[in-house]
């Protein structure tokens, strides 16, 4: 009986949450900007207001979106980059900035010069 309860709880947990492939480019940009600006303010000591930071980052993602749409698979690559960046920075924030940012993971997904998102942060 315990095994059945365990299996049901695991299945229930597996069914929850969002499917990352169903989240739009704009939603990923919003998430990435939120986490990036929070991380900069809390972990890096940025003096830039989080709202101003958000506006700048979102504007940059909006500027590159048409360029990404023109190249086959580019938009998907940028969304993957935003997802990985969000995961990495969230892990750092969750540890109260004690966990170092896995820049190698971000670079692997985004490129060292942020090529995956056409230079957007």
Question: Locations of the language-model features?
Answer:
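Signals and flexible motifs at protein termini associated with secretion
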Residues: 1-121
């Amino acid at each position: 009986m315990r095994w059945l309860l365990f299996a049901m709880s695991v299945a229930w947990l597996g069914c929850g949450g969002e499917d990352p492939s169903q989240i739009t480019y704009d939603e990923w940009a919003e998430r990435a900007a939120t986490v990036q600006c929070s991380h900069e303010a809390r972990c890096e000591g940025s003096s830039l207001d989080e709202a101003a930071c958000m506006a700048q980052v979102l504007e940059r993602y909006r500027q590159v979106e048409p360029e990404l749409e023109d190249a086959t698979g580019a938009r998907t690559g940028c969304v993957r980059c935003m997802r990985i960046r969000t995961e990495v920075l969230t892990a750092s924030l969750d540890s109260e900035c004690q966990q170092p940012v896995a820049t190698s993971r971000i670079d692997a997904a985004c490129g060292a010069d942020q090529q995956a998102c056409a230079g957007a942060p």
